[in-house]
Amino acid sequence: MSEITTTDAQAQPEKKDFIRQIIREDLAHGTHTHIHTRFPPEPNGYLHIGHAKAICLDFGVAAEFGGHCTLRMDDTNPSKEDPAFAAAIQEDVSWLGFHWNALRHTSDYFEVLYLAAEKLIADGKAYVCDLNSQQVREYRGTLTEAGRPSPWRERSPDENLELFRQMRAGTFPDGTRTLRAKIDMASGNINLRDPALYRIKHVEHQNTGNTWPIYPMYDFAHALSDAIEGITHSLCTLEFEDHRPLYDWCINHVDLPNNSHLLKPLLDKGFPQEPSQPRQIEFSRLNINYTVMSKRKLTALVDEKLVEGWDDPRMYTLQGLRRRGYTPAAMRLFVERIGISKQNSIIDFSVLENCLRENLDTIAPRRMATIAPMKLVLTNLAEDHEEQLIFPNHPKDDTQGTRTVPFSRELWIERDDFSEAPPKGWKRLIPGGEVRLRGAGIARIDEVVKNAEGHVIALHGWLDPTSRPGMEGAHRKVKGTIHWVSAPHAVAAEIRLYDRLFSIEKPDDNTDGKTYRDFLNPDSKRVVHGYIEPAAAQTAPEHAFQFERLGYFVTDRHDHDATHPVFNRSVTLRDTWQRD
């Protein structure tokens, strides 16, 4: 795994997107002397490719400016969260090549958040409301109609404080009361119409157990967690732009830098205390065609067994992309290539695939394999003919060294490399025609062997002994070159040919009454059984190769071993997707 360090990041060409420009200005004007960002996922599912953009931005910005990035689990909704998700998130961030300066949980700050809520109550800025969720929606109003104040909006601070403490004591059932901010029920921004700060949920928490029957709402917890951790720039996607006034309201009215007594619970835990006045900045989220990235829809794909789990190589989770053979370097290159802006757009899936091709072309050793094998017998060689040929591991990188490749009288070739009735421009095998066998010489087809049904089952041919590389006959011109695998030495392998999960660019488009389920690509996974050269089998899981003329493949993360090789196709050699 490649690791991104501050030195590495600072050595890269200067990036000039609007977020980095803001940070440069803040540093130049003395607004901040150091940069501190955070990546705050909720541990209620697996990270997907959209999160990769946020991870690269949050950690990348911190590294570029010599700062820090905190990984924070936003664990305020315990009924949907799981320690397994939290562990997977840490694994994914590390896999991408990033390291956090501290691992935190919003639950680490529950005592501080509670004290902050009591401060707002005492200041007359928050009240306990008895409206249920349906009534709250009715009172909130619409985009064109002002909301109505709750009947309990004018409770006294003393009464509110007593009720809030009873909420914490577990006196009331779920959903019967909330703590709400007292802001403006006529605001044009619905997020400011007395939003909830706390709700009652008698649910056991993965970190705090049954200590808390109340939990803070996202906007309140997120803003104050940023301030508690000393975050300088809170980077969010555009859907949080309308939440920014509430973010600022929470930070300004709690005012942690001037109310240090609220941080005492952190002192008792030994946590650092350097509260800040963070600035929220929004950027466009990542949208890619041929995908869905809604957590609800991804969960449905798994629960309905439309895919084979969260790490199915067709999924757009980081776990799935990793198993497919995507590399951290390719993911980071993709994020760099699409850039950072405030304009929502849809990125073509081919951009992601091309980033992987570009990376693997540089690093992946070459091997030979056949995925639709057919026998070629070179009849002018002895039946026991066997030799070892020397092949480079990479044609453009001598540092990757060489390997020995066995060669014999009987070879496996690709069935698609032979045609009895070739189309115009055909450059491969035909009856009586010649082709160059990669690294072994020129072969001529003398006989086509068929079964009783008339299907071709084997070819018999002749190898020109003067056409080996380095011999005079090697310069004789033939139209095509094909790959092969020595049949006696070949290792049988399971090869999984993956393609796009959806068959149309916008699987989320429900205008004709269909859903994304109706657009699943029936050819997104095909399993074939082929043959590979021995050097491809003797390798660990998650090792990438270019199978010459076939594409880039990776040994499966879970199912591969030397006795049962399993390869996943990561990407074809070129974009062959047929668009409508």
UniProtKB/Swiss-Prot annotation:
Keyword annotations of the record: Aminoacyl-tRNA synthetase, ATP-binding, Cytoplasm, Ligase, Nucleotide-binding, Protein biosynthesis
'KMSKS' region (motif): residue ranges: 292-296
GO MF, one annotated term: glutamine-tRNA ligase activity
Top-level taxon of origin: Bacteria
Transmembrane annotation, as ranges: none
Record flagged with keyword Lipid metabolism: no
Gene3D superfamilies per record: Glutamyl-trna Synthetase, Domain 2, Glutamyl-tRNA Synthetase, Domain 3, HUPs, Ribosomal Protein L25, Chain P
Catalytic activity: tRNA(Gln) + L-glutamine + ATP = L-glutaminyl-tRNA(Gln) + AMP + diphosphate
Motif 'HIGH' region location, chain numbering: 41-51
Chain sites annotated for binding L-glutamine: 74, 218
EC class: ligase
GO BP terms: glutaminyl-tRNA aminoacylation; glutamyl-tRNA aminoacylation
EC number(s) recorded for this UniProt protein: 6.1.1.18
Compartment(s): Cytoplasm
Cross-referenced InterPro entries: Gln-tRNA-synth (IPR004514), Gln/Glu-tRNA_Ligase (IPR050132), Gln_tRNA_ligase_bac (IPR022861), Glu/Gln-tRNA-synth (IPR000924), Glu/Gln-tRNA-synth_Ib_cat-dom (IPR020058), Glu/Gln-tRNA-synth_Ib_codon-bd (IPR020059), Glu_tRNA_lig_a-bdl (IPR020061), Rbsml_bL25/Gln-tRNA_synth_N (IPR020056)
GO cellular component, one term: cytosol
The protein's assembly and partners: Monomer.
Similarity annotation: Belongs to the class-I aminoacyl-tRNA synthetase family.
Protein name per its UniProtKB record: Glutamine--tRNA ligase
Gene behind the chain: glnS
